[in-house]
C-alpha cells in the first residue's frame, strides 16, 4: 500500500474517533447536569431547614419528618402520639402537608444508626429522635447536614452532650426533657411505705441518663430516710438474675426511665410479686402494667410540646440551634389500686387511678 495513502487513512480514523469521543462526552455532561438539577429541588412547604439545604425530601407539597424511636414501650409510644398531635396543632397534618417515616430500633444501637443514616440519605426535612440513644445517634448522623433534630424523652440533655449547662443547644438540635421529679417520688414512697429503708434501682450501664438518675436518687434519698441500692445490667439478658439479686437486699424497687429495664418490666414485676416487694414506676404506662404508683409526667403532653417545637422549626419561625430544651415542672400522682392492695398498701389521697 502507498505509504502516503496509509498515513491519510490513519489520520482520518483518528479524527473520527476524536469526534465520536467529543459527542459522547457532551452527552454525559448533559446527563450529569440534568441529574444535579433534579437532586437540587426544594420543598414547597416553606420550611427553613429545607430552604437552607436545598435538597431535602419532599412528597409534592408535603414536608417529610423522620421519627426514630429507640425502643417500643408505652411511654415512648405516647411521646410519638403526642409529637404527631403537636405537629398538627402547629399546622402539619398527615395526609395533607406532612409525610411521616416512622422507624423503631428495637433497643438496638446498630439498628438505630441505620435508621438515622437512612433519614439522612432520604434527606428528610426534620428528624424526631425519641430517647437519649436515638437522639445522640441521630445528631451524630445529621451533624454535617442542614437537617435539624428535635428530641424527646431525654432525662438529661446536658449529660447526653446535646445541650449546654444553660439549656442552650450544642448544634442544630433541641427538644424536651422528661427529667424525673425525684424528690416528689421519694416523698410518695415514704407516704405509702413509712417503715421502708432500702429502695432498689435497676439500670443499664450504657444509658448515661440512667446513671445520672441513680446518682441523683442516691443524693436525695437520705433526706427521706432511704438508702438506694443499685444494680447495673449491660443488656436485657442480665435483667432476670439482676432482679433476683437486688430483691434480696431491698424493701421495694423504684423503676426509672431506663429503656433496657422498661423493656423487661414484665419480668421485673413478676419476680417482685413473687418476692412480695412492691415496684414503683416513673410514668403512667409503668403503673398500668403493675407498678404500685408513680409521680410521673404525661408523655402524650411531653410529645405534644415537642411537636409544637418541631412545627416552628419547619415553618422557619425558629432554628433548632437557637432553642433551649424544655423541661416540665408538674407531675401527677398515678396509682394502681389493684397492685397496691396485693401488697397490703394504701395509696395517698388524690391519686389518679390507672389500673389495667
Predicted regions located by residue number:
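Bacterial lipoprotein signal-peptidase II cleavage site
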Residues: 23-55
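Hydrophobic alpha-helical segments within soluble ligand-binding/sensing domains
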Residues: 58-59, 156-198, 297-318
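Extracytoplasmic "Venus flytrap"
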Residues: 59, 63-90, 101-110, 206-207, ...
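An alpha-beta-alpha
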Residues: 65, 83, 174-221, 323-339
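Structural motif
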Residues: 99-121, 232-246
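Beta-alpha junction/loop-to-helix N-cap segments that form part of ligand/metal-binding clefts
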Residues: 104-164, 258-277
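Flexible loop/hinge segments that line or gate small-molecule binding clefts
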Residues: 137, 142-182, 281-293
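Hinge/cleft segment of the Venus flytrap/periplasmic-binding protein
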Residues: 312-356
Amino acid at each position: 500500500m502507498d505509504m502516503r495513502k496509509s498515513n491519510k487513512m490513519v489520520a482520518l480514523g483518528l479524527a473520527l474517533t476524536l469526534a465520536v469521543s467529543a459527542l459522547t462526552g457532551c452527552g454525559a455532561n448533559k446527563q450529569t447536569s440534568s441529574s444535579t438539577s433534579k437532586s437540587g429541588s426544594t420543598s414547597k412547604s416553606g420550611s427553613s431547614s429545607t430552604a437552607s439545604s436545598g435538597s431535602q425530601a419532599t412528597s409534592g407539597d408535603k414536608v417529610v419528618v423522620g421519627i426514630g424511636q429507640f425502643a417500643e414501650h408505652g411511654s415512648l409510644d405516647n411521646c410519638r402520639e403526642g409529637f404527631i398531635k403537636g405537629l398538627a396543632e402547629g399546622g402539619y397534618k398527615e395526609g395533607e402537608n406532612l409525610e411521616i417515616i416512622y422507624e423503631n430500633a428495637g433497643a438496638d444501637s446498630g439498628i438505630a444508626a441505620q435508621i438515622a443514616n437512612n433519614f439522612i440519605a432520604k434527606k428528610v426535612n426534620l428528624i424526631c429522635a425519641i430517647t437519649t440513644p436515638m437522639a445522640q445517634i441521630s445528631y451524630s448522623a445529621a451533624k454535617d447536614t442542614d437537617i435539624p433534630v428535635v428530641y424527646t424523652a431525654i432525662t438529661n440533655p446536658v449529660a447526653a452532650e446535646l445541650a449546654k449547662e444553660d439549656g442552650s443547644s450544642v448544634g442544630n438540635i433541641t427538644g424536651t426533657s422528661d427529667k424525673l421529679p425525684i424528690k416528689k417520688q421519694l416523698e410518695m414512697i415514704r407516704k405509702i411505705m413509712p417503715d421502708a429503708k432500702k429502695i432498689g434501682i435497676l439500670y443499664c450501664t450504657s444509658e448515661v441518663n440512667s446513671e445520672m438518675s441513680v446518682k441523683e436518687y442516691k443524693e436525695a434519698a437520705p433526706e427521706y430516710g432511704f438508702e438506694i441500692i443499685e444494680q447495673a445490667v449491660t443488656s436485657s439478658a442480665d435483667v432476670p438474675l439482676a432482679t433476683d439479686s437486688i430483691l434480696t437486699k431491698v424493701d421495694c424497687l423504684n423503676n426509672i426511665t431506663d429503656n433496657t429495664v422498661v423493656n423487661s418490666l414484665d419480668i421485673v414485676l413478676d419476680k417482685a410479686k413473687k418476692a412480695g416487694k412492691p415496684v414503683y414506676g416513673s410514668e403512667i404506662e409503668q403503673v398500668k402494667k403493675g407498678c404500685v404508683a408513680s409521680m410521673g409526667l404525661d408523655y402524650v403532653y411531653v410529645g405534644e410540646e415537642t411537636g409544637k417545637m418541631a412545627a416552628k422549626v419547619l415553618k422557619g419561625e425558629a432554628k433548632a440551634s437557637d432553642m433551649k430544651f424544655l423541661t416540665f415542672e408538674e407531675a401527677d400522682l398515678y396509682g394502681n389500686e389493684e397492685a397496691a392492695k396485693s401488697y397490703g398498701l394504701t395509696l395517698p389521697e388524690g391519686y389518679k387511678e390507672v389500673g389495667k
